[in-house]
Amino acid sequence: MRHSPRKRFGQNFLQDKYIINEILRAINPLADDNMLEIGPGLGALTQPLLQKLNQLTAIEIDTDLQSYLTCLPASQGKLNLIPADALTVDFCQFGPHLRVVGNLPYNISTPLLIYLLKFITCIDDMHFMLQKEVVERIAAAHGTKAYGRLSVMLQYHCEVEYLFDVPPEAFEPRPKVDSAIVRLTPYRVSPFESVNTEKLENIVAKAFAMRRKTLTNNLKGIISLSQLNDLGIDGGKRPEQISVAEYVQLAKFISN
């Protein structure tokens, strides 16, 4: 099929067979898995997944691609295609133990990752191809330049594994940036205290609103320097120097 990639959907189609096989190896799909693919595109990953699975659900927003995907020989009787924007879908409707995969459009990858956290109790694992810079941010340790809101929110909910890089020449058209594969596995037993996710997201967003300012400055009116000291958190530090566990402490304090 000749399909002109659409800029508004951030489309870059994976074509490199070696990379596709490496992604499949990382996912390790089993026949009875409850698997969902976001943005299947031209089916580079969809078709080999269908060969291994009894059933695959896929969410595709592009109407041209929806028609193409339903006509693939491998899709017959096995592909459950949802014509929708992934940012509007209730992922828990597909049942428990959901395994989510996808080459996420770079223009919506961050909001989509944050959105998926709402359905984390229904998800067993997630394997995504993302812009390399986004994967670096997700996996970043506190105290590093890449560490930010996305790092805290995803590391609070999931074990993060940076798997491997994908060069631009693996795609058509070639993106101007490198890509990478990440595995996100929601904790069954969390290493962190349980807190209100909305409160955590709010405190993290405020803390990182101005990265060059101190935590005390960014959280002015929410928590005082003396209260930070009582929690054992250095208010003179910048937001990227505060660990996930410390942000959890802050969210718990605000909730109380």
UniProtKB/Swiss-Prot annotation:
It is found in: Cytoplasm. SMART domains: rADc (SM00650). Keywords: Cytoplasm, Methyltransferase, RNA-binding, rRNA processing, S-adenosyl-L-methionine, Transferase. Its main location: cytoplasm. Pfam families: RrnaAD. It comes from Legionella pneumophila subsp. pneumophila (strain Philadelphia 1 / ATCC 33152 / DSM 7513). S-adenosyl-L-methionine binds at N12, L14, G39, E60, D85, N103. The keyword S-adenosyl-L-methionine applies. This is Ribosomal RNA small subunit methyltransferase A. Its EC number is 2.1.1.182. The keyword Isomerase does not apply.
